[in-house]
Amino acid sequence: MKPSVILYKALPDDLLQRLQEHFTVHQVANLSPQTVEQNAAIFAEAEGLLGSNENVDAALLEKMPKLRATSTISVGYDNFDVDALTARKILLMHTPTVLTETVADTLMALVLSTARRVVEVAERVKAGEWTASIGPDWYGTDVHHKTLGIVGMGRIGMALAQRAQFGFNMPILYNARRHHKEAEERFNARYCDLDTLLQESDFVCLILPLTDETHHLFGAEQFAKMKSSAIFINAGRGPVVDENALIAALQKGEIHAAGLDVFEQEPLSVDSPLLSMANVVAVPHIGSATHETRYGMAACAVDNLIDALQGKVEKNCVNPHVAD
């Protein structure tokens, strides 16, 4: 008899078929308490869980006594109670490598669109404001040869550094938990403390996961240390930034502009002051949102669940020690 798994995110037909070759698959719309209650017997028997954008906490795990592995279609897993999973010896799988290049593309797009005011001036053209030769009020700022500060030199940080160094001749500063020898050798990146990075960078790109240590890592103190001409980019996790402090820094002119793919609350409220600022490019968490990459992430998550329930945790496992 095939193991039972719960799928709470739609999959392409071929990937659903692959999953069904290994498991009895039960599809649900979400992991809300109402859904769990209505499908209590299914949740009680499930050995696997696959999906994204839902919280997996201790309360849910209490309803799933046979759960052995959960697979998220994402690289981030801050919506999972890792301690609760680990305490119950439940494997947590994620998709860390598939989206690297695509998210780096998004970061570079935010750098370019904020610096060159692409969104703002495009809207002005559509509004009929381009009636003569443009003047300084249409101008942006250069990207090439400007200093890029990267906070978080992981896979995505490395991919961004490659684009910035080889594509735009940008000097690279970085701050991370440890020195990154490859970044220093390939991109001539210079490790520095966070204060130095903030003071010297023309663009500050934040690429950090959300943890207890990184929550509100960027606040009023950090923005005050940046150049008034600096542009802030965040495509990591929204709550790493104190959004009210960011809004205040933009309103006071402490920083020049911001390109944001993530926010403290998502979707972003239509009443957010960020949406009324011409110097803010706000996009709806599109970091990995291409057809190719989202398919690749889903395929990776399917394979991860198959591997996990077969005891294979050599890659893409957040807590592999629980399999010991």
Curated annotation (Swiss-Prot):
Domain of life the protein comes from: Bacteria
Any GO MF annotation of the entry: glyoxylate reductase (NADPH) activity
Active-site residues (renumbered): 237, 266, 285
Function of the protein: Catalyzes the NADPH-dependent reduction of glyoxylate and hydroxypyruvate into glycolate and glycerate, respectively.
Record text on subunit structure and interactions: Homodimer.
HAMAP family: 2_Hacid_dh_C_GhrB
Protein's UniProt name: Glyoxylate/hydroxypyruvate reductase B
Gene this chain is encoded by: ghrB
